[in-house]
């Protein structure tokens, strides 16, 4: 349960203000079928994060060195500081609109997650916990927790929530996780 909860909270916080939240907002404005968007996000996240968690698990299992916990915890701190850098509002192309909400959400979310903070966090969580199933389940839940409200109430939320303050809180959690892990060594 710890792996699931840590993975969920970590990705939920990492996702705040991320480009995929902006993507959710843009897709929700373009498509009326919210359920298809959510299912597309879910499918893309499960595949992307399962591969990422597996990679982290594989790396920690195949590079059994006493430096691995140090590398993982320092990486959490680095991701924490990375969260302080706002993502750019990337334009969503309209060339895939004819495929429908599900396929557009699936393709764009899968691509947007490649090399993203949440994918890096998922790799790190996979390396730390060596539990592909629970990390994938937790990180997928985190993505949905962060994106479903944006799909349904994005414009109203973005006008009321000071994103810069939330970004600092999310960054602090990552840095504290890394520091806690370093102290535990």
Regions found by a protein language model. Name each.
Residues 1-16, 78, 88-112, 135-137, ...:
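Small-residue-enriched transmembrane helix starts and helix-helix packing motifs
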Residues 116:
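Conserved substrate/cofactor phosphate-moiety recognition/catalytic segment
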């Amino acid at each position: 349960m710890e792996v699931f909860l840590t993975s969920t909270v970590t990705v939920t916080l990492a996702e705040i203000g991320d480009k995929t939240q902006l993507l959710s907002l843009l897709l929700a404005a373009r498509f009326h079928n919210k359920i298809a968007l959510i299912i597309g996000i879910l499918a893309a996240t499960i595949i992307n994060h399962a591969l990422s968690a597996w990679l982290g698990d594989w790396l920690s299992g195949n590079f059994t060195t006493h430096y691995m916990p140090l590398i993982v915890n320092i990486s959490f701190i680095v991701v924490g500081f990375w969260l302080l850098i706002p993502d750019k509002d990337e334009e969503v192309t309209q060339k895939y609109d004819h495929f429908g909400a599900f396929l557009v959400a699936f393709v764009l979310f899968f691509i947007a997650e490649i090399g993203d903070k949440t994918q890096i966090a998922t790799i790190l969580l996979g390396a730390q916990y060596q539990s592909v199933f629970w990390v994938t389940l937790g990180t997928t839940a985190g993505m949905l927790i962060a994106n479903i409200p944006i799909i349904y109430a994005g414009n109203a939320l973005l006008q009321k929530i000071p994103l810069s303050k939330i970004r600092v809180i999310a960054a602090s959690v990552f840095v504290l996780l890394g520091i806690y892990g370093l102290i535990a060594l």
